[in-house]
Regions:
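C-terminal cap of thioredoxin/glutaredoxin-like
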Residues: 9, 80-153
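Structural alpha/beta surface segment adjacent to cysteine/selenocysteine redox centers
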Residues: 2-83
Length: 153
C-alpha cells in the first residue's frame, strides 16, 4: 500500500481526483496489529482531508514505524506522526483502545475478503475491474481514460 500511495496515488490524485474526474475510496485491509492500529489512529480524524493527509504520512514513513515486533514502540511511532499533524495524544490513546472501532475495521476486512475475494494489498478496483498484482500508473491511466471517453456526451 505504501508503494502504491507513493508511486501511483499522488499522480492519480493530481490528474483525476483533484480534477473531480474520478472518485477515490480507500478501504482499510489491515493484515497485522500494526496496520490495524495505524487505521485506528487514521480514523481519529473526523475530517476526510486530514485522514488522507495522515494516511499519506503513515505510508511515507512506514519503513520507520512498521519495524520490529514491539507493538508499543510501533504505536508510539504512529502516534508521533499523528501528533505532527495535530492529533491529540490522549485522543489517539482512546482510539487505540476503542474495541468497537477495532471490530468495525476487522469486520470490514472480512466482508471485503468475502465479497471481492481480496488476497493481497493493495487491491485496486476501477469500476468493477480488479487490479491485484498490476500496479502501474500507465495501466490505471489507460483504464480511467477509456471509461472517461465512454462517458463523454
Amino acid at each position: 500500500c505504501a508503494s502504491f500511495h507513493k508511486n501511483i496515488f499522488e499522480e492519480l490524485k493530481k490528474d483525476y481526483i483533484d480534477q473531480k474526474l474520478v472518485k477515490f475510496e480507500h478501504h482499510s485491509f489491515p493484515l497485522d496489529l500494526a496496520a490495524l492500529n495505524a487505521e485506528l489512529i487514521v480514523r481519529c480524524h473526523a475530517d476526510n482531508q486530514k485522514k488522507f493527509q495522515l494516511l499519506g504520512e503513515i505510508y511515507k514513513k512506514q519503513n520507520k514505524w512498521a519495524v520490529g515486533s514491539d507493538i508499543k514502540k510501533i504505536n508510539e511511532s504512529i502516534k508521533k506522526i499523528g501528533s505532527e499533524l495535530g492529533l491529540d495524544k490522549i485522543k489517539m490513546n482512546e482510539c487505540l483502545k476503542n474495541e468497537d472501532a477495532q471490530d468495525q475495521i476487522l469486520n470490514e476486512r472480512i466482508e471485503a475478503q468475502k465479497k471481492y475475494k481480496i488476497q493481497s494489498t493493495p487491491t485496486i478496483f476501477i469500476n468493477d475491474k480488479q487490479y491485484e498484482n498490476e500496479h502501474k500508473y500507465k495501466l490505471f491511466k489507460k483504464a480511467i481514460e477509456k471509461i472517461l471517453k465512454k462517458n463523454e456526451i
